[in-house]
Amino acid sequence: MKKFTVLLAVILFSGFILIGFKLAARVFPLRQASRTETSLPSPEPYEQSNFILFQVNDLQIKNPQLIAIWVNLKSTSPSSELFFVSLYPTTDLEKNDQIKSIFSLTRDHQLTASSFRRFKRIFDLAFDGYFVVDNSGLLSLASNASVEQLELISDSPLSLESVALVQKSGKVFLSKICDLLSSGAGNSFFSQVDWTTLMPAHFISNKTLDDFQGLIVQDNLSSEYKTCNVIIPE
């Protein structure tokens, strides 16, 4: 948990003071005790968006199994900063079961409204939207990003070994995305992706395809990200 606090300092000193505090206190509490509310200094105003990202095994089956959850924290003002923080799985297997039990999709594989509300509540974050990608979709995106090898599992992680594997594969992929965005090569990556084929068979969202493409265009028009980090709390 101490390592997690140190890693969160990256976010705290980059303007995400309130978010970092909430993630540390709500998602990975040091102990089960009542918290003392502390007044925090108001950070400099900034433009920020938060998206929650889900990885499942297969969107073509009746009940896709949850593999991983990440939160994407993006600030475009006063500076362009991007963070991917792992929320699930953790090394606390009991907590993993609790988080997994909240995940639920509708018949057309959209995240249920109750699940979305509960994830907002337990992580204490206001999400601007969500994305769900299955293993096939992730492998396709990894190929477009020139990730040579990505080891995936087909069921929810139930052991520390599978947790480590999921975290490693997620970090490999998202670190490559960070490299592309930080170097200004994001447009080249996104232009290679056949989104009309990927969505909705292997990639779904509460955003329409037009909305999603608009987000991509917005990112590509903005300056290169000064900071892009992948964080796995421990």
Positions of PLM-derived features:
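Non-catalytic, solvent-exposed segments at the cell envelope interface
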Residues: 2-6, 10-234
